[in-house]
A protein has these predicted regions:
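Short acidic-glycine-tyrosine-enriched beta hairpin
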Residues: 73-94
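Short secondary-structure capping micro-motifs at structural edges
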Residues: 28, 46-48, 57, 79-80, ...
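Cyclic nucleotide-binding regulatory domains
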Residues: 71, 87, 100-102
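His/acidic/aromatic-lined binding-pocket segments of jelly-roll/cupin-type domains
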Residues: 39, 50-52, 57-62, 81-82, ...
Length: 119
C-alpha cells in the first residue's frame, strides 16, 4: 500500500547525493515538486544584486557554511546584513525586502517558503 505522501528521509544524505547540482550558476534544487510549499536546498558561491519580498514568511536553515541575508528595512537607508551560520535557523516575516547572499562556496542552506500564486 502506498502512502499519499513521502516518507522521512536523511536530509544530509540528500545533500551529499545532489551536492554537484548545488553550484553556480543555478545552485539550487527543489526537493518536492508537487506541493504548496517550496522546499529547496541552495548552494553557495553566488551573490545576488536583486531584492524581493514575499507575502508570507520564509524559513532559512543554514546546513553548512554561512550566508548573509541582506535586509532592506527602509527605502533610502543602507541594507542590514544578517549572518546565518551553520546550524542556525531564521524565520523572515512577510513583506520584508531581502537579498540572500551566498558568497561561501561551501555553504549549503535549506529554504522553505509558500508557493506564490500565479500572476
Amino acid at each position: 500500500m502506498g502512502f499519499p505522501f513521502s516518507l522521512p528521509f536523511d536530509l544530509q544524505g540528500w545533500v551529499d547525493e545532489h551536492r554537484h547540482e548545488l553550484r553556480p550558476p543555478v545552485a539550487n534544487r527543489q526537493i518536492w515538486q508537487d506541493s504548496d510549499m517550496i522546499v529547496m536546498v541552495v548552494g553557495g558561491g553566488n551573490r545576488r544584486t536583486d531584492y524581493h519580498d514575499d507575502p508570507r514568511p520564509e524559513f532559512f536553515h543554514q546546513i553548512e557554511g554561512s550566508m548573509v541575508l541582506r535586509i532592506m528595512e527602509d527605502e533610502g537607508h543602507p541594507p542590514v546584513d544578517l549572518e546565518i551560520r551553520a546550524g542556525e535557523v531564521f524565520l523572515l516575516p512577510p513583506g520584508i525586502r531581502h537579498s540572500p547572499q551566498r558568497a561561501d562556496p561551501d555553504g549549503i542552506g535549506l529554504v522553505v517558503e509558500y508557493a506564490r500564486p500565479e500572476g
